[in-house]
């Protein structure tokens, strides 16, 4: 929105030329989203407390979590508001990639909102019935997948980039839709599974978004994309503003979500943020790099799959509890230790993911 206003005022005020620079708008995006989150945080927390919208803790969960019962939840509303307002202010709204991410962010946010609402109002830890949750997640992902395929059919936008190989970029054809579906839905649920400890999900989300900001910038730059042997996608550069909005909003939320948490993001936040990260990965053609950079999310998801599979096939559990962060809690690790160590792992994995752009 601001970029359109700046274009009108440039002939009269040279200062507005600054808004042409992606780097300047990216900085403003971080600061705006951070500022909005910090401003909304205390107000939202107070409102949630007045409405008695508190976390419902499963009885079969770790005993240490019982003290979290009643902590305000649905704080993801603050994250989504900060991201959306920031994007509308600083992004180029004529860019279709921006709207694709916003569509998934708000669509999955709506699904998460209904899920959280059912939990806190009915005091039911199950929330939205699983089949309906997956139905709406699938519907949104497929609509976006078909739209993106129709827009970029048989171009670099539908190629698969394989890390560590310089020119291995097969054209996916209709398989692009299948891959897009699984990446968006899978990442959404993976972030949701990770969101079990104070600050555990939001910091890896911030780190992965920061990594994708770098990738989006390189992908949208004709010289760097050629140098790194990745597809040149001119629309991708505007995703830098989207990624930095996620970074800023995430850091602002972490201010209140750090241990001991004053508020939880709930499914409204985790499902939406995961869906947004998956969509960004698809748009910059780095789905496989997402697996590396989002390794913490992958690890959490695999621990659940292995736990359920092992119990059904052998009648035995591999971990004391899944997702795996609960396993370490039950081993005696204090919650802050689990959180910070997972953050460190995430930071290392993001750096490895970025290194794959050059190591080919």
Curated annotation (Swiss-Prot):
PROSITE patterns: MRAY_1 (PS01347), MRAY_2 (PS01348)
The UniProt record lists the keyword Ligase: no
Localization per record: Cell inner membrane
The keyword rRNA processing is annotated on this UniProt entry: no
Main location: membrane
InterPro entries named in the record: Glycosyl_transferase_4 (IPR000715), PNAcMuramoyl-5peptid_Trfase (IPR003524), PNAcMuramoyl-5peptid_Trfase_CS (IPR018480)
Pathway: Cell wall biogenesis; peptidoglycan biosynthesis
Any matching Pfam family: Glycos_transf_4
MF terms (GO), sorted A to Z: metal ion binding; phospho-N-acetylmuramoyl-pentapeptide-transferase activity; UDP-N-acetylmuramoyl-L-alanyl-D-glutamyl-meso-2,6-diaminopimelyl-D-alanyl-D-alanine:undecaprenyl-phosphate transferase activity
Cofactor(s) the protein requires to work: Mg(2+)
Root EC class: transferase
GO CC entries: plasma membrane
Residue ranges of the TM segments: 21-41, 73-93, 94-114, 132-152, 168-188, 199-219, 236-256, 263-283, 288-308, 338-358
Superkingdom of the organism of origin: Bacteria
Membrane topology note: Multi-pass membrane protein
Keywords attached to this entry: Cell cycle, Cell division, Cell inner membrane, Cell membrane, Cell shape, Cell wall biogenesis/degradation, Magnesium, Membrane, Metal-binding, Peptidoglycan synthesis, Transferase, Transmembrane, Transmembrane helix
Reactions that this protein is recorded to catalyse: UDP-N-acetyl-alpha-D-muramoyl-L-alanyl-gamma-D-glutamyl-meso-2,6-diaminopimeloyl-D-alanyl-D-alanine + di-trans,octa-cis-undecaprenyl phosphate = di-trans,octa-cis-undecaprenyl diphospho-N-acetyl-alpha-D-muramoyl-L-alanyl-D-glutamyl-meso-2,6-diaminopimeloyl-D-alanyl-D-alanine + UMP
Protein name, per record: Phospho-N-acetylmuramoyl-pentapeptide-transferase
């Amino acid at each position: 929105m601001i970029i359109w206003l700046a274009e009108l005022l440039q002939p009269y005020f040279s200062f507005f030329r600054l808004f042409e620079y992606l780097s300047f708008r990216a900085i403003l995006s971080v600061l705006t989203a951070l500022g909005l989150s910090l401003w909304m945080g205390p107000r939202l927390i107070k409102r949630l407390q007045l409405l008695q919208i508190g976390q419902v803790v499963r009885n079969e969960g770790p005993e240490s979590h019982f003290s979290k019962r009643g902590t305000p939840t649905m704080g993801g509303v603050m994250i989504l508001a900060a991201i959306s307002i920031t994007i509308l202010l600083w992004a180029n709204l004529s860019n279709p990639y921006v709207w694709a991410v916003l569509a998934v962010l708000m669509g999955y946010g709506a699904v998460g909102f209904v899920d959280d609402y059912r939990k806190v109002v009915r005091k039911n830890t199950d929330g939205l019935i699983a089949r309906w949750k997956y139905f709406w997640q699938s519907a949104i992902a497929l609509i976006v997948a078909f739209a993106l395929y129709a827009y970029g059919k048989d171009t670099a936008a539908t190629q698969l980039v394989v890390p560590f190989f310089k020119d291995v970029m097969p054209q996916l054809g209709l398989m692009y839709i299948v891959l897009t579906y699984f990446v968006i839905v899978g990442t959404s649920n993976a972030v949701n599974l990770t969101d079990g400890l104070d600050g555990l999900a939001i910091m890896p989300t911030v780190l992965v978004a920061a990594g994708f900001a770098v990738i989006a910038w390189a992908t949208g730059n004709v010289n760097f994309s050629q140098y790194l042997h990745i597809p040149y996608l001119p629309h991708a550069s505007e995703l830098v503003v989207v990624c930095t909005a996620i970074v800023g909003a995430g850091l602002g939320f972490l201010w209140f979500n750090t241990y001991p948490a004053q508020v939880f993001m709930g499914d409204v936040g985790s499902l939406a943020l995961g869906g947004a990260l998956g969509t960004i990965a698809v748009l910059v053609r780095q789905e496989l790099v997402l697996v590396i950079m989002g390794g913490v999310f992958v690890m959490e998801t695999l621990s659940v799959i292995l736990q359920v599979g092992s119990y059904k096939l052998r009648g035995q559990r591999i971990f004391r509890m899944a997702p795996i962060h609960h396993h370490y809690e039950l081993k005696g690790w204090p919650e802050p230790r689990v959180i910070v160590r997972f953050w460190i792992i995430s930071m290392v994995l993001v750096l490895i993911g970025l290194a794959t752009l050059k190591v080919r």
